[in-house]
């Protein structure tokens, strides 16, 4: 089969490189979450892909950067009392996030050029990696437009652009992770007693939808909602969920509705996964791993909300969502490319 043939052509070095790139993106997601939660993302008011590699050096350079920050809505409305020392802390967190993005980009680009030069990649892989390279560059542009949306008249970024930034990271991660799986799981067999690829594809869609609403929750600060809101107390009041007109705006603009949908999808994913695993009775490591990651993610989500979005828990909750998606993708590819074992 063609896939198996391509897999045999992928050398160990390429597999290691793909794995490192995936880990790098997970680290970026973690640091990105910390940057948002510490309100550091708007501290750097310019986008300099080359010069921006170097941080301010000396007192005068730091003062110049702070003067630029003083013109932003965030300073005027929220951080008007910030000291130079406090500004440095915010700046360096955002600086590290941007620097890490450059490092991850180079971690992908340089080995890609090397493996291409050494003819370690077949034509299809080269095309795929060129697309990924362009997406990484585009991610930098999307990130800047997201930051820019918080430098005009509001002291926070657009939750839509924040979501686009996160989903693009998820897409890049998926493409790299999928290629890693195709390169690693090389056995192809169709001796499958029960085909569960459709339901796990649906679970993938649900997880992506959940990540989308999780990002909207973050952008709208819905995680900081009063814990006595009706639906949290076991009651459902439509006036809280549907007070914005037209009604469909509530799905994306109403923090109460967005948080409610986020919790609803989480419950749905949990039930679908549990029921599916019980029905199919999969005796597979990735199936057990999926269940463990799902329970961990639900626990992190509940604790994050209950304790008013602490930085550590919220950051772990965000990156674990990517890991959950990766594990489900792993299981999906395992079912497609490997022989399944079932407990009768």
Curated annotation (Swiss-Prot):
Keywords, comma-separated and alphabetical: Cell membrane, Heme biosynthesis, Iron, Membrane, Metal-binding, Oxidoreductase, Transmembrane, Transmembrane helix
Membrane-spanning residues where?
14-34, 95-115, 125-145, 162-182, 198-218, 260-280, 287-307, 311-331
Against Pfam families, the record matches this protein to: COX15-CtaA
Location, primary (coarse class): membrane
Q: Which GO terms describe its biological process?
A: heme A biosynthetic process
Pathway stated in the Swiss-Prot or TrEMBL entry: Porphyrin-containing compound metabolism; heme A biosynthesis; heme A from heme O: step 1/1
One Gene Ontology MF term = oxidoreductase activity, acting on NAD(P)H, heme protein as acceptor
Is ATP-binding one of the keywords? no
Q: Which cofactor does it need?
A: heme b
* Keyword tRNA processing applies: no
Signal peptide residues on this chain, from the entry's feature table: none
Residues given in the record as heme binding sites: 262, 317
Reaction(s) catalysed by this chain, per the record, are: Fe(II)-heme o + 2 A + H2O = Fe(II)-heme a + 2 AH2
The compartments listed are: Cell membrane
Q: Which InterPro entries match?
A: COX15/CtaA_fam (IPR003780), HemeA_Synthase_type2 (IPR023754)
Q: How does it sit in the membrane?
A: Multi-pass membrane protein
Q: What is its EC number?
A: 1.17.99.9
Q: Name one GO cellular component term.
A: plasma membrane
Oligomer status and interactors: Interacts with CtaB.
The record's family statement is: Belongs to the COX15/CtaA family. Type 2 subfamily.
Function description: Catalyzes the conversion of heme O to heme A by two successive hydroxylations of the methyl group at C8. The first hydroxylation forms heme I, the second hydroxylation results in an unstable dihydroxymethyl group, which spontaneously dehydrates, resulting in the formyl group of heme A.
Q: What is this protein called?
A: Heme A synthase
